[in-house]
Amino acid sequence: MRLQHLADFKPQAATRAWASIPNPNGLPLIATATSDKSVRVYSLNNFTLHSTLEGGHERSVRSAAWKPGVRTDGALTIATGSFDATMGIWRRKEDAGNGNGNDGGDGPLEMEIGADGEVSKGAQLRRGGEEDEDEGDDWEFSIVLEGHDSEIKNVAYSPSGQWLASCSRDKTIWIWEEIGEEGEDEFETVAVLQDHKADVKCVCWRKDDGNGEVLASGSYDDTILLSREDGEGDWETVATLEGHEGTVWNLDWEPEVSMKTESSDESSAPATPRLLSSSADMSIRIWSKVPTPPPQNKPSYFNPGIPSTMRPGPENETWECTATLPKVHDLPIYSISWSKQTGRVVSTGGDGKIAIYEEQTKGRNSVGGTIEKEWVVLTVLEGAHGPYEINHVTWCQRFDNGKKTPDEEMVITTGDDGLTKAWCIEENVEERTLEA
């Protein structure tokens, strides 16, 4: 296997590009956050600029997140987090819902901020809701969310779209909920988590498995925290994962494709997704929840048939590091991504390398008969952005005419050179370590 350069997204940013986030709703669009205070939305069909979000922030846009699902009026939503300590909500009524992704940003626009402008504490309309002449002419900067005291490092919507999380250099994580009717742009702060002891670098949601959606966060304090809502509206930390010896830069939850096992025991409890983490200690770790037997004669916490006053609160969980991927990187690993199609992992970081790993079966344990697996390196590409650091990597579905199968994936990297690059995967190639 090897990575082959497919395309550069045009035009590139004139300054550092931080991260590129594919649209989660199947649209051929990807949003790139940049240091020039804007977000570029590119078409995945032809790797060209689709539209631009600009005029809403006073400093670098560090992170962007698409809201899952599509509103009934067809509007797309992107949340942005900036070094100016604010988060922005952007709307666009999108013709590109037809899936072609080729329009030049001339689709119908959402020009009005809904309702009477009433917003909750912690949120206010930018400049009283007046149209900003400096804003991009295709996306509307609908609302600004304020509360952080310092740079926002990451923003993320929960899989259901109910929650929006932001983390900051101020050591806090804010969780927001959109409470107004569609088009009203009314947000409420539902929690401010303050359990990290240093700069919080990343947040990553796990979908609801019957126990509520879970938020993982990584920090400069070298720890990972897991938090969730207790059913009464309060959020609390349910697990602390310790083991890294440097800043935790990125997290990703295990996709369903890699959770499938060869076990035929249908009576076993559903597996809890594993958590992937990367760090300044140049390691990539996999964390697994330690199973705990259910308490006897005790109702399930989230059983809707039990009155809330009788349900026990969520108990603390124990997690352990169950695997460490082979060492490839020589500098901090800024970004990782776990493929929803193949279960492979891709990583990148300050050394400019891109590495792809795969979990393979070794055999069965002779004692307990359990399946033994190991992670192997499939390929390493060096100097992918020349001498520049790579800040972000993600798996992404291919939409261009060159794809060989409907579900074919590519790798997207975003770097300090302002470039967003697409890489295709060539299987059955012997070379393992290559230079771009």
Swiss-Prot record:
Which keywords annotate this record? Repeat, WD repeat
Does the keyword Nucleotide-binding feature in the UniProt annotation?
no
Q: Which domain of life is it from?
A: Eukaryota
Q: Does the keyword Ubl conjugation apply?
A: no
Q: Give the residue ranges for region: Disordered.
A: 94-113, 118-137, 295-316
Q: Which family does it belong to?
A: Belongs to the WD repeat CIA1 family.
Write the protein's name.
Probable cytosolic iron-sulfur protein assembly protein 1
What taxonomic ancestry is recorded?
A: Eukaryota, Fungi, Dikarya, Ascomycota, Pezizomycotina
What would be the name of the gene that encodes this protein? cia1
